[in-house]
Design a protein with these regions (language model features):
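Bacterial N-terminal signal peptides that target proteins for export
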Residues: 1-10
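Structured, solvent-exposed acidic/aromatic patches
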Residues: 38-42, 73-372, 389-393, 478
Length: 479
């Protein structure tokens, strides 16, 4: 059994050192003549990308947390996570896989002796994406000391986010076609220009994320990237995604629904798509299997098992067949998001641009991404959809949230940052007072294996509770 904990990885050199007095022949005996002593960067990069795609769309991060808490899906059986009834062990695999599998592999690529700076830059960019996911889910996290100390200190989220801005710029600057090809890249197939665009697009995302806390820094970065928009993801063909193949390397949603049937599309999402006469509805959801139900029906969030059962499992909509295909992609960044960021930046006066134009482009890009963009103008002309500057946050919030379907943790982050859409807790929530989760618990292993740094983190950030706001999640947003 593979133990995926950072401390095991970090203790290996200590264990090896302790046995250096043993006969050198022992090492020779234990060598596998058919094994690769130093895994190749191409293999490690492929593994890190595949594991990240599984992690991003998988069980503990997605089905039992972000997909429910952002109200894209709802539970109809085993409803505890949908009622926020989770424990400090619920997110251990999110933490462990993020650090000891994905980031560990990327560190190995970056630290390899291969004389190819592009490999190191791509690894740095993908590692930055992983750190961004981790800090947005947990808050303060080990960052600057990770893999350098057995018990790494936690960096404040502010320092993590600003550190990632710098790392991504450094990586983008070092990517050059003359540095060599990048094999094993399952996202952009070694295309250096695409990786530069992805790096700068991530910087744009982070800049907006910190805008409520450090407006000067955020505004400068957003304005600079707006002036150099050609350096960003500029079409759906440039989206960052990972295309799965077939079993056993298949899309996690397809895998889950092949053996279980305890999730449905949320009533929150389906009702909003109906309100908007949204052509993405038959892409996002299926008609219920009960032939007597002729319209799409969502499941309510936050119900007890008995309450959920009373809705009728076969009277509710499963996720759309597009998302349940073996080879459905994991999507990490889209052209739609770029446009919504600039729409918000224009509405807030950060850039001198037409917020309505970027809002419309964001919606159109999402419709086209899912193959239903032919009647975009008609959709945009509806009173319920047409841009209203006095309601910019609400409108951008809803449309961006819809476009994030399949990117649950990103939707969860943006909802906390922007304050829209206005989601409501279900009747069986264990949090009380209508509260909603705003972060993940730290894994229980942090308390036992890295206790002093864990305590320092919660002393700085606040209690290790689901309702504790992270640094970027300002309470009084004044939208």
């Amino acid at each position: 059994m593979k133990i995926k904990t950072i401390y095991i990885y970090l203790l290996l050199p200590v264990i090896v050192f302790a046995f250096t007095s043993c006969d050198d022949k022992l090492a020779e005996i234990n060598k596998n003549p058919n094994a690769t002593e130093n895994p190749q960067p191409a293999y490690l990069l492929s593994a890190a990308q595949y594991h990240a795609a599984q992690w991003f769309m998988g069980n503990d991060l997605n089905y039992n947390a972000a997909l429910l808490w952002d109200q894209h899906w709802a539970k109809i059986q085993y409803t505890e996570p949908d009622c926020y009834n989770v424990t400090t062990s619920s997110f251990s695999s999110v933490w462990d896989d993020g650090y000891a599998t994905i980031i560990a592999d990327l560190n190995a690529v970056e630290n390899s002796n291969l004389g190819n700076a592009n490999y190191r830059a791509v690894a740095k960019i993908w590692r930055s994406w992983t750190f961004l996911q981790l800090t947005n889910l947990f808050g303060d996290i080990p960052y600057s000391q990770y893999a350098k100390k057995v018990t790494p200190a936690y960096d404040n989220q502010e320092d993590v986010l600003k550190g990632l801005l710098g790392e991504l710029q450094t990586a983008a600057d070092s990517l050059k076609s003359t540095n060599g090809s990048v094999s094993g890249d399952l996202i952009y197939k070694g295309d250096i220009t695409s990786w530069k665009r992805f790096a700068q697009s991530l910087r744009l995302r982070i800049a907006l994320e910190i805008a409520d806390r450090d407006q000067e820094l955020a505004s400068g970065i957003i304005a600079q990237l707006y002036a150099n928009r050609s350096e960003l993801i500029s079409s759906n063909s440039e989206n960052a995604d990972f295309v799965f193949t077939s079993s056993p390397q298949w899309n996690p949603w397809a895998s889950a629904f092949s053996t279980r049937d305890d999730q449905r599309v949320s009533k929150t999402l389906i009702d909003k798509l109906k309100e908007y006469n949204d052509p993405r509805l038959p892409i996002y959801a299926q008609l219920p299997s009960d032939a007597t139900v002729t319209t799409y029906q969502g499941a309510a969030n936050g119900l007890s098992a008995d309450q959920a059962n009373s809705q009728g499992f076969n009277k509710l909509s499963r996720p759309g067949t597009y998302f349940l295909k073996d080879n459905a992609p994991a999507v990490f960044f889209t052209y739609s998001e770029i446009n919504f960021i600039f729409a918000e930046a224009a509405a807030r006066g950060i850039i001198n641009a037409d917020a309505q134009d970027f809002y419309n482009k964001g919606i159109t890009a999402s419709l086209q991404q899912f193959g239903v963009g032919d009647n975009a103008d008609k959709y945009l002309a509806q009173p319920s959809v047409a841009y209203d500057a006095s309601k910019w946050a609400e409108q951008i919030g809803w449309q961006k949230w819809i476009s994030y379907y399949g990117q649950a943790s990103d939707a969860f982050t943006d909802w906390r940052r922007l304050g829209y859409p206005k989601l409501k807790a279900g009747p069986s929530s264990v949090l009380g007072k209508g509260q909603l989760p705003r972060r993940f618990f730290y894994p229980v292993t942090e308390q036992s294996l890295n206790g002093s740094n864990y305590k320092a983190a919660i002393a700085h950030q606040g209690p290790d509770e689901l309702t504790t706001r992270l640094w970027f999640d300002v309470e009084n947003k004044n939208r």
